Design a protein with these regions (language model features):
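Short cysteine-rich clusters marking metal-coordination/redox-active sites
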Residues: 3-4, 43
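Cys/His-rich microdomains that often coordinate metals
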Residues: 8-10, 49-50
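Short Cys/His-rich Zn2+-coordinating modules
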Residues: 21-30
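Short, compact, well-ordered microdomains
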Residues: 41-72
């Protein structure tokens, strides 16, 4: 394999599947969410996370990749845990958001947790998530 190209790609690559980059990204599947048709990959060279999803069009579905930048020391499992906490808080307020917005909120909360010296445990994340969602008036 040649040097990976993760840093040369934009944050969103529309119309491309991760398999189109075989030999250019040393990807490894780390999670698959069948109800959402979303797969999470990690580049084994540079440790960049990629989310592959499909957007419905009038003539089928178009794949797209989204680069996920995690806060320092965070794992994909931490992100998933934080998304669950954020979704639980929003569900308790009868607020529904899509997966991308939930992920964005979770990444914001994780960034705050890291900046304040916290970790990514469920209790800490829940505390920061409640505070952050109040600040942004959700």
């Amino acid at each position: 394999m040649k040097q990976c190209i993760c840093n040369q790609l934009t944050d969103i690559v529309e119309g491309e599947s991760i398999k189109n980059f075989q030999g250019k990204i040393a990807y490894k599947e780390i999670a698959f969410y069948p109800t959402l048709w979303v797969t999470l990959y990690k580049c084994e060279c540079c440790h960049t996370f990629w989310k592959e999803a499909y957007k419905a069009t009038g003539h089928g579905e178009v794949p797209f990749l989204t680069k996920i930048t995690l806060p320092p020391y965070a794992t994909a499992e931490d992100l998933q845990k934080c998304m669950v906490v954020v979704r639980e808080i929003l569900d308790s307020k009868a607020i529904t958001i899509n997966e991308e917005h939930c992920q964005a909120l979770a990444l914001e909360v994780m960034g705050i947790s890291y900046a304040k010296g916290g970790d990514y445990s469920s209790e800490i994340i829940k505390s920061f998530a409640k505070g952050y969602l109040k600040i942004v008036e959700i």
